Amino acid sequence: MAARRPRTAPEHESDDDSYEVLDLTEYARRHHWWNRLFGRNSGPIVEKYSVATQIVMGGVTGWCAGFLFQKVGKLAATAVGGGFLLLQIASHSGYVQVDWKRVEKDVNKAKKQLKKRANKAAPEINTLIEESTEFIKQNIVVSSGFVGGFLLGLAS
């Protein structure tokens, strides 16, 4: 912001003070988020580390993410499958009666709502996809290491 000169009592009523207007969107485009967090000397990984280091960093983080995804996925699949199995047993035993027409009506209603929301959210999703592909293009070595590590983490 522009500096203002100190005001005295008579100047307080005058409207001749000038201010500089800053465009925050342009500022944000020029100053990436990592510069605000980590300082001016930080930047894209490509400029800082060797190819081997980038592959190892991507591979290790990918393996950790894949391993966690596998464990959480197994737990979620077990919970959903177990719940479905219990509902089937209860249904066949006569404890639960399913109104299939109502289920079909609710599913169709949910489909319509999802289509409406998907059409509204399309610009934000496209922007996110564009930013992600740009990041992957700029950091292809780290990204490929991450994908490889992720697949290894899923397999282990």
From Swiss-Prot:
Cystine residue pairs: none
GO cellular component: mitochondrial outer membrane
One Pfam match: FUN14
Main localization (coarse): mitochondrion
Keyword Membrane on entry: yes
Motif interval(s): YXXL: 19-22
Gene Ontology terms describing biological process: autophagy of mitochondrion; response to hypoxia
Keywords annotated in UniProt: Autophagy, Membrane, Mitochondrion, Mitochondrion outer membrane, Transmembrane, Transmembrane helix
Protein name listed in UniProt: FUN14 domain-containing protein 1
Name of the encoding gene: FUNDC1
